[in-house]
Curated annotation (Swiss-Prot):
Induction: Expressed in both exponential and stationary phase in rich medium; expression is higher in stationary phase (at protein level). This is Protein YkiE. It comes from the Bacteria.
Length: 22
């Protein structure tokens, strides 16, 4: 797709990850 969706995901180990869907 021509757009992407990104959001912050907080895991149970308190680590911040960026999840992006293209």
């Amino acid at each position: 797709m021509g757009w992407s969706l990104c959001f912050w995901h907080v895991s149970v180990r308190m680590t911040h990850d960026v999840v992006c869907y293209y």
